[in-house]
Amino acid sequence: MSVIKRLEERYGEKVQSEVVYNNEHARVLRFYLRAEQEVKPHKSPSSVFITVLKGKLLFLVNDGKSEEILNAGDTVFYNPEELHGFKAIEDSIVEAVITPNPSVNKLNIS
Protein backbone atom coordinates (compact mmCIF):
# COMPACT_ATOMS: atom_id res chain seq x y z
CA MET A 1 0.00 0.00 0.00
CA SER A 2 1.16 3.53 -0.77
CA VAL A 3 -0.31 6.77 0.53
CA ILE A 4 0.32 9.93 -1.46
CA LYS A 5 -0.80 13.10 0.31
CA ARG A 6 1.19 15.84 -1.35
CA LEU A 7 -0.40 18.35 -3.66
CA GLU A 8 2.39 20.84 -4.00
CA GLU A 9 2.31 23.54 -6.60
CA ARG A 10 5.27 22.96 -8.92
CA TYR A 11 4.63 25.43 -11.71
CA GLY A 12 7.32 26.50 -14.18
CA GLU A 13 7.85 28.29 -17.47
CA LYS A 14 6.84 25.06 -19.23
CA VAL A 15 4.27 22.43 -18.24
CA GLN A 16 5.70 20.50 -15.30
CA SER A 17 4.96 16.83 -14.75
CA GLU A 18 5.86 14.13 -12.28
CA VAL A 19 5.31 10.41 -12.04
CA VAL A 20 3.21 9.81 -8.93
CA TYR A 21 2.98 6.03 -9.34
CA ASN A 22 4.37 3.59 -11.87
CA ASN A 23 4.19 -0.18 -12.27
CA GLU A 24 3.53 -2.65 -15.08
CA HIS A 25 -0.25 -2.13 -14.79
CA ALA A 26 -0.65 1.63 -14.55
CA ARG A 27 1.13 4.96 -14.61
CA VAL A 28 -0.14 7.98 -12.69
CA LEU A 29 1.15 11.37 -13.80
CA ARG A 30 0.52 14.78 -12.30
CA PHE A 31 0.72 17.89 -14.52
CA TYR A 32 1.17 21.47 -13.31
CA LEU A 33 0.12 24.16 -15.78
CA ARG A 34 0.12 27.91 -15.52
CA ALA A 35 -2.71 29.73 -17.32
CA GLU A 36 -2.30 29.39 -21.11
CA GLN A 37 0.14 26.46 -20.90
CA GLU A 38 -0.95 23.31 -22.70
CA VAL A 39 -0.32 19.64 -23.29
CA LYS A 40 -0.50 19.44 -27.07
CA PRO A 41 -2.92 16.98 -28.70
CA HIS A 42 -1.53 13.45 -28.81
CA LYS A 43 -2.61 9.81 -28.66
CA SER A 44 -1.82 7.03 -26.22
CA PRO A 45 -1.99 3.26 -26.79
CA SER A 46 -3.71 3.02 -23.39
CA SER A 47 -6.90 4.22 -21.72
CA VAL A 48 -6.43 7.59 -20.02
CA PHE A 49 -8.46 9.00 -17.11
CA ILE A 50 -7.73 12.65 -16.30
CA THR A 51 -9.01 14.37 -13.16
CA VAL A 52 -8.73 18.10 -12.56
CA LEU A 53 -7.38 18.54 -9.03
CA LYS A 54 -7.18 22.33 -9.13
CA GLY A 55 -8.10 25.05 -11.61
CA LYS A 56 -9.96 25.15 -14.92
CA LEU A 57 -8.86 23.72 -18.27
CA LEU A 58 -10.08 23.36 -21.84
CA PHE A 59 -9.96 19.71 -22.96
CA LEU A 60 -10.17 18.23 -26.45
CA VAL A 61 -12.96 15.63 -26.54
CA ASN A 62 -14.67 13.43 -29.14
CA ASP A 63 -11.32 12.50 -30.72
CA GLY A 64 -10.37 16.16 -31.07
CA LYS A 65 -13.63 17.23 -32.74
CA SER A 66 -14.84 19.41 -29.86
CA GLU A 67 -13.74 21.05 -26.62
CA GLU A 68 -15.04 20.94 -23.06
CA ILE A 69 -14.19 23.07 -20.02
CA LEU A 70 -13.45 21.04 -16.90
CA ASN A 71 -13.11 22.36 -13.35
CA ALA A 72 -11.63 20.98 -10.14
CA GLY A 73 -13.28 17.65 -9.38
CA ASP A 74 -14.19 16.87 -13.01
CA THR A 75 -12.86 13.78 -14.81
CA VAL A 76 -12.56 12.90 -18.49
CA PHE A 77 -11.92 9.44 -20.00
CA TYR A 78 -10.14 8.76 -23.29
CA ASN A 79 -10.11 5.44 -25.14
CA PRO A 80 -6.82 4.05 -26.49
CA GLU A 81 -5.63 5.96 -29.59
CA GLU A 82 -8.17 8.76 -29.00
CA LEU A 83 -6.73 12.23 -29.64
CA HIS A 84 -6.53 14.26 -26.44
CA GLY A 85 -4.85 17.33 -25.00
CA PHE A 86 -5.65 20.24 -22.71
CA LYS A 87 -4.93 23.91 -22.10
CA ALA A 88 -5.07 25.71 -18.75
CA ILE A 89 -7.51 28.59 -18.46
CA GLU A 90 -6.08 29.33 -15.01
CA ASP A 91 -3.24 27.83 -12.98
CA SER A 92 -4.18 24.15 -12.76
CA ILE A 93 -3.13 20.72 -11.56
CA VAL A 94 -4.39 17.54 -13.24
CA GLU A 95 -3.76 13.87 -12.60
CA ALA A 96 -3.73 11.28 -15.38
CA VAL A 97 -4.16 7.56 -14.77
CA ILE A 98 -2.91 5.61 -17.79
CA THR A 99 -3.73 1.91 -17.99
CA PRO A 100 -2.23 -0.36 -19.01
CA ASN A 101 1.12 1.34 -18.52
CA PRO A 102 2.56 2.20 -21.95
CA SER A 103 6.26 1.80 -22.50
CA VAL A 104 8.21 5.04 -22.06
CA ASN A 105 9.04 5.28 -25.77
CA LYS A 106 5.35 5.14 -26.74
CA LEU A 107 4.21 7.95 -24.43
CA ASN A 108 4.84 11.20 -26.30
CA ILE A 109 3.31 14.29 -24.74
CA SER A 110 5.64 17.01 -25.94
Give the residues covered by each predicted segment.
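A short, N-terminal "cap"/entry segment at the start of jelly-roll beta-barrel domains
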Residues: M1-H25, L60, N71, S110
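Conserved short histidine dyad/triad with adjacent acidic residue
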Residues: R27-S44
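Short, surface-exposed secondary-structure edge patches
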Residues: R30, F49, K65-E68, G85
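Histidine-centered metal-chelating micro-motifs
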Residues: E38-V39, L58, V76, P80-G85
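Glycine- and acidic-residue-biased ligand/ion/polar-headgroup-sensing regions
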Residues: S46-L60
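Short acidic-glycine-tyrosine-enriched beta hairpin
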Residues: G64-P80
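Ligand-binding loop in jelly-roll beta-barrel domains
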Residues: N71, P80-S103
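Short peripheral tails and domain-boundary helices/loops at the edges of structured domains
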Residues: P102-S110
